[in-house]
Every structure is written in C-alpha cells, then in structure tokens.
Amino acid sequence: MTVNISYLTDMDGVLIKEGEMIPGADRFLQSLTDNNVEFMVLTNNSIFTPRDLSARLKTSGLDIPPERIWTSATATAHFLKSQVKEGTAYVVGESGLTTALHTAGWILTDANPEFVVLGETRTYSFEAITTAINLILGGARFICTNPDVTGPSPSGILPATGSVAALITAATGAEPYYIGKPNPVMMRSALNTIGAHSEHTVMIGDRMDTDVKSGLEAGLSTVLVRSGISDDAEIRRYPFRPTHVINSIADLADCWDDPFGDGAFHVPDEQQFTD
C-alpha cells in the first residue's frame, strides 16, 4: 500500500500563534519530512522573504527550510512571470516582495512601469501611494499581494494591503487583482512548485474566509483547526464547510497519512502505475 498525499498548511494560527509554536506542529512536520511527504507552508505575509521566515520559525522551534515556504510575495512574482517573462513594476512593499520580483527577473522602476504592485509594509509612504495612483492613472496595471485589510502589531491593529488598495481604487477607479489567499491562484502555484495534484492534497488552515475557501476553490480537501481564530460559531456563518474540523494540528501528527480516517489517500501498489 502506497500513500499518495501532500499538504499545504497555513502558518499563523496553525503552526505558530503570537510567535509561539502551537504544540504538536513540530511532530506533524517531522512526520511529513520522515516520510518524504511533499508540503508547503503558506502565508499572506509579503513583508519577509522565505529565508527570513524560516529563521523566525526556527526561533519558535520549527525547522522549515525556505524552499518549503510560499508567501503571497513569491506567489505574486510567480504569477507575474507567467504573464510577462521579464516585466517592469513599481512596487510599494518591503524586501519580501522586492526580492521575489528581482529573483523572477523583473525590473523595479517608477518610469512608465507595466504594473503597480502593492504589498504589505509597516510604513506606508504617502509619497509612494501618490506615485502608485498616478502610474495607474497613466496605464499601469494594478496587482496586490493579498486582500487583508488589517494586520496585527505590538501596538494594535495596522492597516494592511487591502485598506491601502481601497484608497488607491477610490482615487483611480482601478480594481486590483489580488494574488494571495483566498485566490486559488496562490494554491495552484504552490502545488506546481512541489509537484503535487489537488486531488491528493490537503489544505490546513484556521480561517474559513481565506484558507478553507481557497482550498475548496482549488479542489483540495480542507482541514480547519480551532487553534487560530475560528470556532464552531464562525464555521456556521458560511455556506460552505471544511472537509474536517480538528482542535489543532497535533491531531494530525499520528494520522498524517489518513487524516479523514477513510483511507482516501492509500493507493494499492498495483494501481500506482495506472493512475
């Protein structure tokens, strides 16, 4: 019997919470590594590079290599490269986004760029936003890394990409195309990167509106954990349901190969060459 399963998992609320590892996350990831299971950790955070996030996760007790981390910035760079192999963009964002675009072979410029790309930053500049508005009015296409309207900080809630995008839309009339969750484009690009198929992949998340929705729309089985922001009352608010609901990722550490208890990802050896 062969196990044919891959995983996409959200980061905040699933693996870590407020900078601390959620108990059992290390055991789950180690089970995947020990059994050569393909997986990718997803985050709508575009501030940090995968290498930065890998280092931060390590301080929380999770050893996840950069190539196993897929941010909304890397997904955005992947998408843009699929549209224009070597394009030009004016970027409002931090190193996670600029590094991803440079790596994809793009040129960052404010001189008649093809795209304006808006990402997360802790210090939105009025001057940069004004430049973005005028470039869009001049014909640049508008892309955003993710639709989140707020984000957490030590001092409280901060306006995030979605809020600033709304300001730019109000000034230009241009609606952005969002790449990050819940857009299934982010899931598809992550799947392609690890060579996985949606039919054999499980998405683990803590949010109905992003994680479960994007997994559902990408054709994945979904697991919602209660260790983040969602509870049973939150689940009932939506017209769709996850495949399975668990308390935390620790519940999957010992059943990673059969998360729903139905043997759906077990393939008889004689069939693995005929699919």
From Swiss-Prot:
pH dependence: Optimum pH is 5.5-8.0.
Gene3D superfamilies in alphabetical order: HAD superfamily/HAD-like
The protein's Enzyme Commission number: 3.1.3.-
Example of a GO cellular component annotation carried by this entry: cytoplasm
Reaction it catalyzes: dihydroxyacetone phosphate + H2O = dihydroxyacetone + phosphate
Pfam family membership, one: Hydrolase_like
Taxonomic superkingdom: Bacteria
Entries under CDD domains matching the protein: HAD_Pase_UmpH-like
Presence of keyword Phosphoprotein: no
SUPFAM superfamilies linked: HAD-like (SSF56784)
Cofactor: Mg(2+)
Keywords, comma-separated and alphabetical: Carbohydrate metabolism, Hydrolase, Magnesium, Metal-binding
Residues of the site described as Orients Asp-12 for proton transfer during catalytic turnover: 56
Active site per database record: 10 (nucleophile), 12 (proton donor/acceptor)
NCBIfam families: HAD-SF-IIA (TIGR01460)
Function: Catalyzes dephosphorylation of dihydroxyacetone phosphate (DHAP) to produce 1,3-dihydroxyacetone (DHA). Is the main enzyme responsible for DHA production from catabolism of sugars (glucose, fructose, and sucrose) in C.glutamicum. Displays no activity toward nucleoside monophosphates (AMP, CMP, GMP, or UMP).
Protein family: Belongs to the HAD-like hydrolase superfamily.
Name of the protein this chain belongs to: Dihydroxyacetone phosphatase
